Amino acid sequence: MKTLGPEAAIPTVVSGTLTTVDHHKISFQHFKNGGLAVIIIAHGYYNSKQCLLLQQLTQALGKEYDIFMFDFRGHGKSSGVFTWTSREGNDLRAVLDFIAPLYSQKGLIAFSMGASISINVLANDKRVDSFVCVSAPSDMSRIDYWVWALDWKKDVAYILFNSQGKIGKGVRPGPFWLAKEKPIDNIGKITIPVMFIHGSRDWVIRPWHSEALYQKTGGLKKIISIKNGPHAEYLMRDYPTQFVAEVKSWFLDTLIKNDS
């Protein structure tokens, strides 16, 4: 990790598109501070890189790292429809094709279905050096959706009626019946350091998913349960200080520090 001076306080932001092997356009933003390490942020379902919570995460991590954000297909400014993790691995691979040659160290933080996609990619792709996996489903067919446990004010009104909560939201859904890999079958193939973070109040994907994935992870690993924490990106809304501190500490410990 490179120590940044005051002149790097305002990053250079590059926006563009990447093309996947199956010809989809993937929209990205690259925040460049001159760091030797980059953190890739992979959003969850119904979110995008424009989500204010992820923009806040970018600001929090951008003081120490360059940041690369992108939209999965069917979300934000990317093309196509969302295939419920079946083909979105091509989107992350296109990101790694572009970003991996530019940095000596690459971290990835992924949320919910984005984390599920990431596990399936990282099982065979070794171009990421450290991984933070937030609220990941261990098996797409076993997502919980405990509707009776949701907080109507925070979980529904925030998205539908809050002006900030609506920014960056939306999805263009595609076929859900396509074959899907199971993260629980792939997590054991990942050899890089992995930290799992899950909110204890997550009603969409219950904490047992992260616990099951953690048990099958063979390398350096850690699991964090945030008491009363909600699902995925909303941990940044309700517990930003704790969430950011855990992420920063993990990447500090698992990405090689380069002082230059």
Regions found by a protein language model. Name each.
Residues I190-T191, F196-H198, D202:
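Short beta-strand/loop motif that positions the catalytic acidic residue
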Residues R73-L102:
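Catalytic nucleophile-loop/oxyanion-hole region of alpha/beta-hydrolase
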Residues M1-N33:
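N-terminal cap/lid segment of alpha/beta-hydrolase-fold proteins
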Residues A123-F176:
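Hydrolase active-site cap/lid region
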Residues G229-P240:
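Catalytic histidine-centered segment of alpha/beta-hydrolase-like enzymes
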Residues R201-I205, E233:
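Acidic catalytic loop of the alpha/beta-hydrolase fold
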Residues T58-S79:
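Conserved alpha/beta-hydrolase
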Residues Y45-T58:
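The serine-hydrolase catalytic nucleophile loop
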